[in-house]
């Protein structure tokens, strides 16, 4: 792919957009920058990084009317809008940073492990990266997990990696056509981002783009959407919490198995919750697909401590355990967190619902929850979706109030779980900030 003298507009000026500007400029493109809202201080900040960079703001159509050949989109901007469709129909090319990386690794021959899914993808990406590093591979962990892929590539100055471990969101996959992973997985499909997609099937089709090429498919045998993603002629490894598969959980013994072979006991896995057994099985299958030895992988699984804000015990007071799952930003993630915990629960839900249907939480909560506390802008919708299923629902103005009220009702042996099933931006700077407030509220009890 050549960019020499190509007029290129980079849309969206967060971390991904900045990395695309840097990469495209280095490769000879004539780059301009666009954001729907640009403050003077942001222009000055970016201008110091890129001498002579031209900025556009306001309507995207007005910017595109300046004769651009390529539109490089940040993940937060959907290409499903009339201005971008018209640009493509007039011969313009639309791509994102993952497509740019795909061109690099395809030419250079780097191996790629690609991970997506509604829930669990960050944990699996981190675990796979950890295992690859522990097994001695020169490993790059990047994508939706935090470091933009082109920022990582520029830092390496073109040096080939043994393996790239990529967490990919559906947004990143929308305009990715050339990525051919050595191994890939879609961990699961549940309602998320339905404010961006037509329906759940549309969302699943976008996720399935991760399986292009002829690499190993690692499939969740318990998920109907994932089962349907099997491609003819491909090597497939299936994992299951429900029945025998290539990798499966024997419920009676709590042992992860491959066929009849015992792999590891769930008691030896530091990560809490049954859903993390699925994460471990997927991670081992992905790592084996790039040639790593099973015995070493299983030993290193035992030392992986997981990620903050993902079903993380933060403390205990008078026998009541407090668990932070602030990263549970959709219904599927929260249902998985609830399913993986055995003790009676008081659950804190709410925030920005992103157009989700919360009724699946009725079944998840009904046999586990002693009480549910609702916060945030979409608390009324959650109440409507859960009303009438026998749950004790309490509206709280703040997260601090929810923590205090839950603790007042809890008894020794109970769990207070923050797993909001919603985005956080109505009340907090992000899920990490929401977690900080939860922890401080616990400490104040």
Curated annotation (Swiss-Prot):
It comes from the Bacteria. It holds the Pfam family Mur_ligase_M. ATP binds at residues 117-123. The keyword Ligase applies. GO terms for biological process: cell division; cell wall organization; peptidoglycan biosynthetic process; regulation of cell shape. Its EC number is 6.3.2.9. InterPro entries: Mur-like_cat_sf, Mur_ligase_C, Mur_ligase_C_dom_sf, Mur_ligase_cen, MurD. It is found in: Cytoplasm. Belongs to the MurCDEF family. This is UDP-N-acetylmuramoylalanine--D-glutamate ligase. It comes from Neisseria gonorrhoeae (strain NCCP11945).
